[in-house]
Amino acid sequence: MAFNIESLLEKKSNPVEEGNDFEEENDSEKNGEEDEEEEEKNVIDGWTNMATSQLAMFAIANDLRTPTLVELQMLLGVSARKHDYKRSRKSVCERKPRQAYSARQLDRLETEFQTDKYLSVNKRIQLSQTLNLTETQIKTWFQNRRTKWKKQLTSSIRQMVKDAPTSTSVGVPFQSLLTPPTPPTTLACHVNSLFACEQ
């Protein structure tokens, strides 16, 4: 039996009216349909495997990147799964209020941060006892301070690069920092010539 839309939409007759002939015919049709479905599945799997391997070979041959999940979904006509759940988050009333640090606490924390960006467990325990804060509060303060420090560092580097053609860094033109280092033999000769000039 051919698989098409009409066969699906046809109203099937009642098997009781047809009798045993229908059951025998139905069994043979089922076996035939199962064989056809299995054959179609094998053909589809074969095409899918071939298309996948050809796509991969094309990508390798042309030095292309692997497609992203979204690109594959668009290519295959599969929509992205929509999630109906939301991340659970503590309500505002359940959350602890922000820690208000005293000037003395902030000064000490800043001093420790300038000394070392990462605290040891012993140092954290000592600070918590000295400043009357919990270890978690100190740990969180240091994490936040490191984040701020990294942002400031990135910003200053960007500014330095932006101003590079006109400024110098420690007496060395910025452009020379971008050039490859001088080979050791030339550098040694240069250093020797400098010492020779001083004598």
UniProtKB/Swiss-Prot annotation:
Compositionally biased tracts (Acidic residues): 18-40
Role: Probable transcription factor. Required for MC motor neuron differentiation and function, including role in modulating pharyngeal pumping. Regulates gene expression of FMRFamide-like neuropeptide flp-2 in MC motor neurons. May act downstream of transcription factor pha-4.
Keywords, sorted A to Z: Developmental protein, DNA-binding, Homeobox, Nucleus
Protein name: Homeobox protein ceh-19
Pfam families hit by this protein: Homeodomain
GO molecular function, one term: DNA-binding transcription factor activity, RNA polymerase II-specific
DNA-binding interval(s): 94-153
Originating species: Caenorhabditis elegans
